[in-house]
Amino acid sequence: MNKKIQTISLNRKARFNYEISDTYEAGIVLTGQEIKAIRKGQVSLAESFVRPENGELWLYNTHIANYQSGANTNFGEQLDPTRKRKLLLHKQDILKLKSKVMEKGLTIMALKIYIKGHIAKAEIGLAKGKKNYDKRRTIMERDLKRETRNWEKRKK
């Protein structure tokens, strides 16, 4: 049974600044206000990262705006928009990620937040920082692809 996937937020800088080796799908523990804000697209992954703590994975610095509605939910309580949120993965995946993060230069980045069916999910990836010359090479390759695509259009 295929569930409809609706992408809400992408972390484009992560794919440019880091080399992503493995990706995982993780559930996110959210409050009612937060899931409503995510469905409206009020989420930013710009500075977000994942850190293992006590055998669990936690998502840091993901900005989910407070949901504004006619009636205040949670009795008017305003949540911290950048609070840490627990990620739900299989134990074996958590242990695998934790052991790889202990290696030099590896980190876990949040790449995407999306809705699968009716559930909010996060795509996280094991990443290693790129050097400046790798970034320049990526830019050159992107420009070359764009130029060849435009050249082919003009040719037709």
Residues of each region from the PLM?
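Ribosome-associated RNA-binding proteins
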Residues: M1-K156
